[in-house]
Every structure is written in C-alpha cells, then in structure tokens.
Curated annotation (Swiss-Prot):
Protein name, entry field: Uncharacterized protein MG350
Amino acid sequence: MKISPDQKDKKSLFKKHFAYLKLTEKELNDPKIQTLLEVAWNHFDQCRKIKERRCSNKGDIHLQAVREWLPWEFNANQLKKNSTKETTQVSENEFMGNVMLMQTICPKLVNKANWFDLTYERFIVTKPNWFKYMDLIPMIQNLPVTPSDKNSFGYAYKKISNLFETEKKTKKRIFFFNLQKNNINNMAACMLTCEIAKKNIKVALIYCEEFVSRYDKSYWKVDDDLNLLDEAKVIIFIGLGQESFHNKNYILFMTRLFINCFLKRKDVFFFSTTYSDGNGLIQTFKNQIISSANWVKHFFEQLNDLLMINI
C-alpha cells in the first residue's frame, strides 16, 4: 500500500509502525520527518513485493533515526537514579537529542557497490552484511545494568576515554584491547567511536567477523577496501578471533592495512575477543599464520619491534 501525501491517517500509521523510534508529537508533526517516514514506509512496501510479501523485517528495521546524543547518557542517568533509590522517572526525551537524519536500511534496497554508509556526519561505517549491526551505531540500545556488567563497563570506559588524546602523541599507532566480554568489546568500541567522532575526526568502525565470510568470495578485492579506508583517520576493529586467520585474502588485507596505517599515519584500535598470554590478539594472529610465509614472519618481527605492545 503506497502512502499518498494527502492520506489523513498517515500520522497514526507512522506512529504504529515506527513506534520503536520513540518520536514525539512535535516530531511526528514535522513535515521533514513526515517525508522521511513516508519514504521509509514506501520502501518497506516495495520490499514486501520484492520478497513476495515475506519480508522478515516487518517494517521495523527499515528505518534508523540518528539523533545528536551520546548513546550511554540515558542509561547512565537511569543508573544514577536507581542507585540513590529515587522514584522519579527519567524521561527518555530529555536525553534523546534532535533527529539528525533518517535512513532506510533494508538489505534489498542497499546499493551493494557502496560499501560504506554515512550514518552520521562524522561516522564512516562498513556494513558487509548490510543491516545486522546498524542499530548499534551511533545509538546503543542495550547497555549493561547488572552490577558486574556495570563494573566491567566502567573499567572499559575508564580505559579508553582518554586514550585518543594521550597515546596518539606517542609513536604507537595501533592499539589492542582484551576486555574479556564480547558485549563489552562491542560497547567499548562504539563508545570510542563516539569519543573520536565528537572531535570532528572521521572514524571507520569495522566488524571483523563479517570480513572473514566475504573474503571467501573472489569478487571482494583487498584494494577496494583499502581505498575506502583512506577516508578515515581512525579505524576501529571489533571481534578479531581465531576464525579470522584461515583466509589468505583476509591475512593479505590485514597485513596491507598495517602498512597502510604506518605510511599514512592512521590510528587503529582493535577490540579483541581472543585471549592468550601477552597481547591476545597479536599472539593469536602470529601463531595462526607465522608459518604461512617468510614475509609474514618478517612483518610481525618488524611490527613488534616498532609497537612494543604491552596491553
């Protein structure tokens, strides 16, 4: 059902189908936002026709609203209220911020020739599987609330909050973190992305496990990725595990990426989900591929000498 501009009940339709966006009445009455919602609904209708009316997204994931806010602000205030046993409820709208843009994100409608989606004016985000992680950037919906998670999250934030300002002044340009929990790795990386983006620096946030599967296909080319990464000053990787080190094209990409970062003075942050003695990620990387070729061994000897990683 295509929505015509003069349809009287389109506001209630939007409110029902896009309730998860938590739009206010003022926003629902905004002509610009109404136009964006109308486009999103029409794209959903188109998608249902493409998939013979069996679209699994059911309209919900077809639209992302990007707001000008820090994703942990609301949850932090909630936790503060709970810790003091106050009964006053914190309104989400106090912390949501203004709508910056809306974007339809159904994979059937994404131009797969464009590997990077500009989802925020200072963000560059790679989406190999096109929509799975889109809801995490820049808005993180499920921050930890249990005492143990809160402590882990606090540790992660403390560890990274001043990192870019302090360590970028040293000779090190590649940084590794083992934060012990997948969800903490993910949130810490997103937080660091926001911290850097606030400084008007373009940052690429990349989910490594998605790279592994797509490098199994011959039409993905390493040079294309490196050219796109040239847009970013800072590159953040999440979830580099052992499964990443069995693909020759992936190893080639990672090696060229390291060299590219040194030559063009980029900062790279890895949030690893693999652990071993010393630095978990670099040791696992080296152990998995050290026998693959002499150039790999030589490369890692140079890399360790240059970086002196002790995290």
